[in-house]
């Protein structure tokens, strides 16, 4: 039996505790030796029961904090119910938990979900030292009345620290000096846009929050330093130290400011003061999230507004911005002439009050994202339909827009400017580099960073080329898939559809009412067919079920009835189940990718860890999720002196591996797992600990309904999930494991629909592998260090046989050194080896011409290769591009985390029905559907891995086009190699789903001289089928006498091993796994045992490596031979399948090591 132990991790006393206890939500045995009667009770009751038992036994310590939080939550929930008359629902509970935990954050939910009610109830709960800020005086009066109704002592229109003070932004700005000494406990902002837009208002808010001016100025200085020096040649150690000082000063003060909660915002902070506030509060005001749409989207190809006569009262007309204010007035008059009361919705709130009271039938406003008509109307009962007078558009002067490198690239390619040299430089820009280039071009400033300054000069040159080309084109309107370029008067404009304004504006007609979403009706009066088609395409990408129907196909009478029915008290509305959760992934990139995939997430930074809040909609189920990265493993086997290298083996046969939190030294970048805040390698105290992540995850887990652990779908990922579940179980009992093999919306939704339990068999397999690695590695490394009197020695079961292969080939290569003649015949290489220079020279002198005869030829069928597995991808990338395995794995990891390919650690060639459909879609649009041959390649159990394939039907050119159109879509920084590897994966997969090709196999007799005849059987032609996307090498040799290309050099008759050779051997001999191919070679390089040749990436053993291997193989052959290693790998697989006992295998390994190693240790001379 294996009993996993965690060092210093008891939630009560901080002592050692077993995983079993943590998973059951219990303290350690020292705190509670015996426990009965709590099985089967809910989490809150369990916490209370355990608290009382600990208290009765005088053992209560840190568990008091958990009990306090739980009971405080209960208190505020009860208070909420007493005040409002109903239980807070899931999302309100999340907000209330955050509020009583003193967190600052944004409530990024649509109107109708109880944001204002929650904020008001919490304000009353606090009772005093509360400042509630609203944008207008009329709203202030409404809030005051509601607060008084809830029982608050209210100060309406001025600040009184003994009460709940409700004030306007205007009051804050005018009376800032009189309230400088006042620091409230809690500040609520109903609409943050006024603060975000105005630097002056930000100054006033900073003062109100109790942030000293010097700290505020430090935050501003920090942002300026980062902006100025990040890409500068002057980014010296002195500047870095100054940045560190400022960061420390801000961090020390963060917990001392007032709690700030923002109920809504529609824009993001851009000014330096607003960014400083974000830095100080730890969160960014985010736009209101779009939870779902319940809208009928329609269009008509004219600007006829007479449809109003049939739809009647309750409409909003949004006029495209280019028509100007005068057209709004004309439309208002037209509506009034039809017999309706109309009013302009341009500013203030009077128009909305009149509309709500039924005094106004139709509102007319501007189709502007920041306009009150688009974002300021919330009338679920009155507003039923929205008419867009003209397609909503964004229009900018083209020459100004060209300062954006990506816009320049797209426009230039559209009009035929050759960007081949510049394209790769632009595509690999980071967002901050692109921004810096953009602003330096606009301002005409140079960049104090040579690489970017050179690129700026190139961009200016290409801008001039684009301008000249446009002058040649003249008046013609240019249309692309994503924008239109038009000349109006003397200026060129670039025009895009304004999809966000369409979504926000049409969303005014579909609001939450009585727990459901009303039906809305949207009509676009199309004034530009090209822009409308682009809008349709973008909408369908974001909402695949979107379908714009021609108004001529709509029964308006039926629609009008449905709209009215939807607004009745018991009407037919779309209802939702909203639940809150914590989604834990391994990497920050993956967290960002998933969060961005479903919505525009809000971000809070807690203890330097970004927490993304995203909305995931799955039909009527809505998840409000905090997405956080664990950054891989949080624990590792302890380095403390416990048992045999951190593992105790008790007489009863129980094995206790002790795990400690992983810490990372930020100076030497090494990780360690001991209970010390000092790096054991370099002595630095600049150490980062996983405890920070665990504390944050516990805090977040306590606030949500469920926890979803989504670490990678392999044994390492399962162990990470097991550890996370252990640490979080005392704080939330609803913990689930979810897995996915690709980061796509469909895969994430499927995973959330099918939560699982942690697979303990996979966990045990990983534990055995890690313990075996620790025992073998530490034991042999220590012997190597003793033998060779040096550091940085290492050994392991897999590393040692691999080192042996490289050592063997290196020795043979060196012993067979001589001279080599390289002969090239029309691309076909021949290599001849000679032991002596003289013989080589004689051979060359006799080699004037080569005679070639074709002696046989036949037609053959060529079958496509299966899609890539980890080993075949590494082999192919090395053979084609000479890339080392660790670099290919890093790139594949990036592509996976960006959601572009399926999981890259796999030994399966299976392709799912989803993958087959992707191939069909791509081949269809490329006109290659006749070559489509669906293949699953191998059977696969449910949930098993797939081969490595793309997640969408876009090739590398389409991917590049996507990045040009939306450079910030993906959360990784692309390089040329990312495109190379993606292209390789994509084409190999597509080929695997295509028909056979027809090839010609030719046999040639190549006569080099009298004695050297070579029979070469070569593929001389290949065409059709999969060859169209994945060409193969062909040799079409000329016949007769040919003068060859000849080169000479020193060389060997023996071939060194390449990365691809080693990976092939690991696979064929059964000692490699998808997770170990690259790591094994990387470790051998790190220990200085092998080096890689620069030109051809051959692996060569060093003298150090040869000595280490000869010692290990002579003393421990039975421990590290490839046969023994292969058997162990097989046993690990059997443990994962529950065919073998993990503890039995570990005891065998321990016995094996003891038998071989202990006698050697006792020898005098190791």
Swiss-Prot record:
Introduction of positive supercoils requires the cooperation of both domains. The helicase-like domain probably does not directly unwind DNA, but more likely acts by driving ATP-dependent conformational changes within the whole enzyme. A beta hairpin in the 'latch' region of the N-terminal domain plays a regulatory role in the enzyme, repressing topoisomerase activity in the absence of ATP and preventing the enzyme from acting as an ATP-independent relaxing enzyme; it also helps to coordinate nucleotide hydrolysis by the ATPase domain with the supercoiling activity of the topoisomerase domain. A motif (DEAD box) lies at residues 190-193. Zn(2+) 1 binds at residues 10, 13, 28, 31. A zinc finger (RG C-terminal-type) spans 662-689. Its EC number is 5.6.2.-. The lineage of its organism: Archaea, Thermoproteota, Thermoprotei, Sulfolobales, Sulfolobaceae. Modifies the topological state of DNA by introducing positive supercoils in an ATP-dependent process. Increases the linking number in steps of +1. In vitro requires high concentrations to supercoil negatively supercoiled DNA, relaxes plasmid DNA first; DNA single-strand binding protein (SSB) from S.solfataricus strain P2 stimulates positive supercoiling. SSB stimulates DNA-binding by reverse gyrase, and thus all subsequent steps. Binds to single-stranded DNA, transiently cleaves and then rejoins the ends, introducing a positive supercoil in the process. Its cofactor is Zn(2+); Mg(2+). Residues 96-285 form the Helicase ATP-binding domain. InterPro entries: DEAD/DEAH_box_helicase_dom, Helicase_ATP-bd, P-loop_NTPase, Reverse_gyrase, Topo_IA_2, Topo_IA_cen, Topo_IA_cen_sub1, Topo_IA_cen_sub3. GO terms for biological process: DNA topological change. Its main location: cytoplasm. It comes from Saccharolobus shibatae (strain ATCC 51178 / DSM 5389 / JCM 8931 / NBRC 15437 / B12) (Sulfolobus shibatae). Zn(2+) 2 binds at residues 665, 668, 679, 682. It is found in: Cytoplasm. It is an enzyme of class 5 (isomerase). This is Reverse gyrase. The gene is rgy.
